Amino acid sequence: MSKNKDQRTAKTLERTWDTLNHLLFISSCLYKLNLKSVAQITLSILAMIISTSLIIVAIIFIASANHKITSTTTIIQDATNQIKNTTPTYLTQNPQLGISPSNPSDITSLITTILDSTTPGVKSTLQSTTVGTKNTTTTQAQPNKPTTKQRQNKPPSKPNNDFHFEVFNFVPCSICSNNPTCWAICKRIPNKKPGKRTTTKPTKKPTPKTTKKGPKPQTTKSKEAPTTKPTEEPTINTTKTNIITTLLTSNTTRNPELTSQMETFHSTSSEGNPSPSQVSITSEYPSQPSSPPNTPR
């Protein structure tokens, strides 16, 4: 019933909280409008009432939460007190034992007797830890953990027999006179001394050295540039003689004086090569006497 009441009150408080918030928002919006003085006064009064009611609702929320917390703490305290007041279960299960919880030494002695009766030949030391409370004392018996140590392997004991002979590595037969057991054990010394063993060391095979031949340098012969000899210019003697003969044949009929000059010029052409300019001058000016050709010095 109490849970249902708490849920109802919580729901009502939430609803009132929401409605009051909405009313505050509406009143603030209306207050911003330019209304008459009476309306503004009423809105301000409503806002004050709503704000105070919101504060009251918040206080109720906090008080209800604190009440729930205190109720849970009281329940926990009651449970712990009940646990402390109750006696241990392992004492109440067997009423025939007649154990009084005030004597922990009697409890440990009885536990050891029970263990000895159930498992004979086994003795385990128990560590009794007494936990003291206000009215009762409980003992918790913890057996010792078995120590795991590696046992050393002992050599087997030799039987104490009188007729036990130890065979040595080497017994010379010269010691044995008439003892048959000695003759059975002894060893004869060889006359020849064992020669030294010849140890042959393995000869290492010579590794053939491979010499890598380097690439031969390629010698490229530089090709000589072809030397072109200057060609001698052909002599113009033949051309000059042909020109002179044509001029003579053409002008013999016209001027007899010019023929004599050309003959003299032809005779001197063998000694010195006249220039073509001189030939053209003589042909253009036939009346003037031709100058003698310049002889080379």
From Swiss-Prot:
This protein's UniProt keywords: Disulfide bond, Glycoprotein, Host cell membrane, Host membrane, Host-virus interaction, Membrane, Secreted, Transmembrane, Transmembrane helix, Viral attachment to host cell, Viral immunoevasion, Virion, Virus entry into host cell
Biased composition (Basic residues): 191-215
Cystine pairings recorded for this chain: 173-186, 176-182
Domain of life from the UniProt record: Viruses
Ranges annotated as spanning the membrane: 38-66
Annotated region (Disordered), positions in chain: 124-161, 191-297
Annotated site (Cleavage): 65-66
Polar residues: bias regions: 254-288
Low complexity compositional bias, start-end: 129-150, 233-253
Cytoplasmic side: 1-37
GO cellular component: extracellular region; host cell plasma membrane; membrane; virion membrane
Ranges where the record places region Binding to host heparan sulfate: 187-198
GO biological process: symbiont entry into host cell; virion attachment to host cell
Positions bearing carbohydrate: 70, 72, 80, 86-87, 92, 100, 105, 113, 117, 119, 135, 137-139, 147, 199, 203, 219, 231, 235, 237, 251, 253, 269-270, 275, 282-283, 287, 290
Pfam families associated with the record: Glycoprotein_G
Chain intervals with Basic and acidic residues compositional bias: 221-232
Extracellular-side positions: 67-297
Annotated family: Belongs to the pneumoviruses glycoprotein G family.
Protein name as catalogued: Major surface glycoprotein G
